[in-house]
Amino acid sequence: MIHSLFLINCSGDIFLEKHWKSVVSQSVCDYFFEAQEKAADVENVPPVISTPHHYLISIYRDKLFFVSVIQTEVPPLFVIEFLHRVADTFQDYFGECSEAAIKDNVVIVYELLEEMLDNGFPLATESNILKELIKPPTILRSGVNSITGSSNVGDTLPTGQLSNIPWRRAGVKYTNNEAYFDVVEEIDAIIDKSGSTVFAEIQGVIDACIKLSGMPDLSLSFMNPRLLDDVSFHPCIRFKRWESERVLSFIPPDGNFRLISYRVSSQNLVAIPVYVKHSISFKENSSCGRFDITIGPKQNMGKTIEGITVTVHMPKVVLNMNLTPTQGSYTFDPVTKVLTWDVGKITPQKLPSLKGLVNLQSGAPKPEENPSLNIQFKIQQLAISGLKVNRLDMYGEKYKPFKGVKYVTKAGKFQVRT
């Protein structure tokens, strides 16, 4: 299936390549570089590129491109999912999926790729199995290996490889048994000039950190599970139980993993947490304009909206901006024409505003349309969809674990049109 894999940085340098069948020349990546030059942004490079003799299927993660070379037609999403598993494995092993981390652990990287793909077909992608096959790097292990010439490859077959729950290894023991869940939601929205919602959607995930001894069987229930759409599950979840009772029943992997990802697409269920009052005007045959925006919380949710950043791509005729913020600080790049206002927290008693003059090129025509505002924010201890965990029950073990749930709401692609 997958013949070769190339890792490419943002500068266009191929810093690692791996071949499972015949060696494919690096020149095949020229088709990828051509598509990259045509793309307006790095995220807009086509994930599937057809060439005369190959297909190039790629993902972009952490400022790196993972480009796989395929010689026969395969389901592209199958390959894309595998490439994401590779990136997730690097993140799990090295703490980050970066060019520096991969170069520092290049031997382990090749060992992992050899185990994850067998003759071009995915074999072992579960982190628990891989960690039994290839030990994660430590300072002590790296020092011993450099002296003795040994490798990180284990000498025993993973206990989970042949079981019906391959995602969990046997014999797990902890002094402190704990199970923590993070409910993280991103809200994507488009707000028109009048403040009405044109589009709104919530993308959510539940990430788990499970450190439990033995072979626990967990059941996670919600107060309102019916609002979830398009749920994607970790393989450990019993799907029939979810279909019948809307309860997540599973034997968890050991450590950190993504339990589910979901979507809330009903616009009447999506609450918009912030509002923006704006007045941006450019006069005809004038060298100046007015800029005035105020941001505030839309409803009293009892939670503080923090980490607010407003980014505006101003028209090309803008030379400079003389603005006064009542809170935070702003920067304007006269080259890229990007205005960034770092607001910080919002308090309902004092709404932050940014207002002042815009200097335009003399004699230039009035901009055809006003710029849009892109907003970033974060709300701690709130799931904007209203999703709440009801309880976590454990079966199969007699100890009582520590349990906890954390909620976070973030802005995804949140745009206000002016």
Swiss-Prot record:
Protein known as: AP-3 complex subunit mu-1
Location of this chain's protein in the cell: Golgi apparatus; Cytoplasmic vesicle membrane
Domain MHD: 176-417
Main location: Golgi
Any GO BP annotation: anterograde synaptic vesicle transport
Coiled-coil stretches noted in the UniProt entry, renumbered to this chain: none
Subunit structure: Adaptor protein complex 3 (AP-3) is a heterotetramer composed of two large adaptins (delta-type subunit AP3D1 and beta-type subunit AP3B1 or AP3B2), a medium adaptin (mu-type subunit AP3M1 or AP3M2) and a small adaptin (sigma-type subunit APS1 or AP3S2). Interacts with AGAP1. AP-3 associates with the BLOC-1 complex.
Gene for this chain: AP3M1
Family named by the database record: Belongs to the adaptor complexes medium subunit family.
UniProt function note: Part of the AP-3 complex, an adaptor-related complex which is not clathrin-associated. The complex is associated with the Golgi region as well as more peripheral structures. It facilitates the budding of vesicles from the Golgi membrane and may be directly involved in trafficking to lysosomes. In concert with the BLOC-1 complex, AP-3 is required to target cargos into vesicles assembled at cell bodies for delivery into neurites and nerve terminals.
Superkingdom assignment: Eukaryota
Membrane topology of the entry: Peripheral membrane protein
InterPro entries associated with the record: Adaptor_comp_med_subunit, AP2_Mu_C_sf, AP_mu_sigma_su, Clathrin_mu, Clathrin_mu_CS, Longin-like_dom_sf, MHD
Keyword annotations: Cytoplasmic vesicle, Golgi apparatus, Membrane, Protein transport, Transport
Entry GO terms, CC: axon cytoplasm; clathrin adaptor complex; cytoplasmic vesicle; cytoplasmic vesicle membrane; Golgi apparatus
Pfam families xref list: Adap_comp_sub (PF00928), Clat_adaptor_s (PF01217)
